[in-house]
Amino acid sequence: MALKSLSEAVSLLLKKPLVWMPGMFAAFAILFIYYMYTLFGSSVALPIGIGLLVIFPAFLAGTYGVIVGDKSSSADFRKYAAYGYFRCLIPNLVIIMLGFLLSNTLTYILLMVGLSVDVALYFSIFLVIPLVFFFYFADITAMVNNFPAFRALKDSVVKVTTGSFHITAFYLFNIALFFAASFIFSAMWSLLAVDALLPISQMTQGEILALSQNELIALFMAPEILSSGFLALAVCASIFIPIVVSYKACFFKRNLLKLEAEPKAEEQQGSFDADGRWYKYS
């Protein structure tokens, strides 16, 4: 079922061009943030990036809606984007805040125990993985079922823990997509910045180890390397974000969406006429 959902998601990229919208917006946001950083610095680029990130759930909601609702017009996309914006935004904000709170709490505890900063940060970042794993379907659940944020989070946990093999296969395919995107990003970045990276590649191991942390950061923050990285990231985002979002919606629709069965006519209050047509009593 996970593989069928993936193949369906890929086919939707051709059948429904609107599912490309999250990737197109993400690519635009990445390049726009880069130009704002280049022209005005991080003090301007950071709030703009946060603002664009807050807008992004509208594109998620629109894509979820046209896939789950089996629609394809731009009017339907806008309708679902407006309807599901806060339903997608709030659960994701709760997850981010919860991850921030738990990771910082764990970092302080590990530092008090006596572990180094690097080890403490490693364990704190690793803590985010279970949150993503269990709450992955919270936003689409909140939108489709019109659940409040915390009920959507709970429902996502229930779906994940009771999904057995299909959920496991779904996450494995997502991990494979992540590694594919990482490989393509690294290859594109290296290809675009080959001239700037050539001096670094010719350095010996001893020369690299002799560099301070600030010197290493300065090397990789060179304009050509930085612009190549942002361009490669934008290209990968425009390709893989639509695949991942469509895959999530297709899998949810095929495996996790519980449609209520319509009540049978015999169980309703009404009667049949002489021609066998059913009339429900009001």
Segments predicted by a language model, with ranges:
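Interfacial aromatic "cap" segments that immediately flank transmembrane helices
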Residues: 1-30, 78-101, 133-182, 281-282
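Hydrophobic alpha-helical transmembrane segments in multi-pass membrane proteins
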Residues: 21-56, 91-112, 119-132, 170-197, ...
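Generic structural hydrophobic/aromatic packing signal, biased to beta-strands
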Residues: 116-117, 251
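Juxtamembrane transition segments at transmembrane-helix termini in multipass membrane proteins
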Residues: 8, 55-72, 131-149, 159, ...
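A general structural detector for well-ordered alpha-helical segments in enzyme core domains, enriched
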Residues: 73-77
